[in-house]
C-alpha cells in the first residue's frame, strides 16, 4: 500500500518514519508540507518524493492512501478531497475544527457508502486502555459510576491558549471516555481553579472538566499542562464492585491486587509510542483487507468536536453546556 504523509512537522515526521521503517504492508512514497525546505529535507532523509501541493499528493495515482498531519484548520478540505478521490485516510485529530465541518465530513463519507477515514485517537490502541475497556464490557466490577482522568504535560508551546486545553488536550479524554464506556457524552462543565505560577500570562492552567454520559456516568478530568516535571495520563474506573486504573507504568492495576510503581514519561511519544505503532499497523491492515477503518471513524471525530465546542462554551461562560449530536447517519 503506497502512502503519502501530508504535513511533516513533529507528528508528521514521526508518522513518516514509522511508515518507512516499521509498518508492515505499507510503502511510504511521498511527503508534503507547506514548508518546502522541510518537505525536501524529510523526503531526502527517507528516500521518497517531495510533493509541495498536498492536493496533488491526494490526486496522484501512485498514492493509494494518505496520512493527514497538517494543522487542524486544513483538515476539512484535505479530508473531503481524499473522500472525493476515494483514498483511504488516517487523519490526525481533530477531524476538523468545528462540529459543523466535522458533520459535513460524516455526510460526505455516508454518501460514499463505505468507511474511508480513520481519526488518530491513538489511546484506543494502548494496551492498558484496551484492557480497561474489556473490563468495563465484562461487567466484572458492575456498572461504571465514575471515570477519574488526569492529563498533565510538562510545558506548553508558544501561543497555546486557554481554549486549547480543551480542543488539543481534553479532546483525548473525550474520545477515550466514549471508547471505554460505549456511550455518548451529553453535557460538559469546565471549572477554573487558581492558575499555576508556571503558566504563561493569560493562560488558564489548570482546568477541571466534568462530563456527563447518557447513562449518568460522571467523567472528570484534571487538565494541567505546565507541571514542569513530565507527562502523566491516568484513568481510574470506579464501578459498583471495585475500581481499576491505567497509567501507573505497570499496566492495569486493580485494587484487589495492589502494588504499583514506575517512572514518569518525558512526553506523549514515550508514553504512547507503542500505541502509535499499533494504530498504524491496524490501519494499514484494514485498508489492505478492504475494511478501510479499524479504529475511530468520522462519527467519533464529529462527537469529539461537538463535546469540545461545548467545553469551550462552558469555559467562556462558567456554565454547564448540554451536547446534542443529532441523529447518527
From Swiss-Prot:
Keyword Iron part of the UniProt annotation: no
Disulfide bridge partners, by residue number: none
GO molecular function: inositol 2-dehydrogenase (NAD+) activity; nucleotide binding
Reaction(s) the record says it catalyses: myo-inositol + NAD(+) = scyllo-inosose + NADH + H(+)
Any single biological process term in GO: inositol catabolic process
Domain of life: Bacteria
EC number of this enzyme: 1.1.1.18
Matching SUPFAM superfamilies: Glyceraldehyde-3-phosphate dehydrogenase-like, C-terminal domain (SSF55347), NAD(P)-binding Rossmann-fold domains (SSF51735)
Membrane-spanning ranges: none
Function field: Involved in the oxidation of myo-inositol (MI) to 2-keto-myo-inositol (2KMI or 2-inosose).
PANTHER family in UniProt: INOSITOL 2-DEHYDROGENASE, PTHR43593
Subunit structure, interactors included: Homotetramer.
Name under which the protein is recorded: Inositol 2-dehydrogenase
Amino acid at each position: 500500500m503506497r502512502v503519502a504523509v501530508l504535513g511533516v512537522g513533529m507528528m508528521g515526521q514521526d508518522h513518516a518514519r514509522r511508515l518507512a521503517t516499521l509498518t508492515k504492508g505499507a510503502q511510504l512514497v511521498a511527503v508534503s508540507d507547506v514548508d518546502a525546505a522541510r518537505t525536501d529535507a524529510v523526503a531526502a532523509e527517507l528516500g521518497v518524493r517531495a510533493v509541495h501541493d498536498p492536493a496533488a499528493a491526494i490526486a496522484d495515482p501512485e498514492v493509494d492512501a494518505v496520512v493527514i498531519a497538517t494543522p487542524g484548520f486544513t483538515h476539512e478540505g484535505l479530508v473531503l478531497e481524499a473522500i472525493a478521490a476515494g483514498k483511504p485516510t488516517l487523519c490526525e485529530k481533530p477531524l476538523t475544527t468545528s462540529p459543523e465541518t466535522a458533520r459535513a465530513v460524516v455526510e460526505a463519507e455516508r454518501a460514499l457508502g463505505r468507511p474511508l477515514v480513520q481519526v488518530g485517537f491513538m489511546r484506543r490502541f494502548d494496551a492498558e486502555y484496551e484492557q480497561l475497556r474489556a473490563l468495563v464490557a465484562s461487567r466484572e466490577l458492575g456498572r461504571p459510576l465514575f471515570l477519574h482522568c488526569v492529563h498533565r504535560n510538562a510545558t506548553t508551546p508558544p501561543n497555546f491558549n486557554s481554549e486549547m486545553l480543551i480542543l488539543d488536550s481534553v479532546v483525548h479524554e473525550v474520545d477515550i471516555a466514549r471508547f471505554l464506556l460505549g456511550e455518548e457524552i451529553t453535557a460538559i462543565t469546565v471549572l477554573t481553579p487558581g492558575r499555576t505560577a508556571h503558566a504563561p500570562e493569560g493562560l488558564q492552567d489548570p482546568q477541571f472538566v466534568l462530563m456527563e454520559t447518557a447513562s449518568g456516568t460522571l467523567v472528570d478530568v484534571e487538565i494541567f499542562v505546565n507541571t514542569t516535571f513530565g507527562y502523566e495520563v491516568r484513568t481510574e474506573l470506579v464501578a459498583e464492585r471495585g475500581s481499576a486504573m491505567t497509567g501507573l507504568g505497570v499496566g492495569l492495576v486493580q485494587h484487589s491486587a495492589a502494588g504499583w510503581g514506575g517512572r514518569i514519561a518525558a512526553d506523549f511519544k514515550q508514553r504512547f509510542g507503542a500505541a502509535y505503532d499499533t494504530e498504524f499497523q491496524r490501519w494499514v491492515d484494514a485498508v489492505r483487507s478492504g475494511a478501510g477503518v479499524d479504529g475511530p471513524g468520522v462519527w467519533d471525530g464529529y462527537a469529539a468536536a461537538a463535546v469540545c465546542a461545548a467545553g469551550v462554551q462552558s469555559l467562556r461562560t462558567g456554565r454547564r453546556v448540554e451536547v446534542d449530536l443529532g441523529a447518527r447517519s
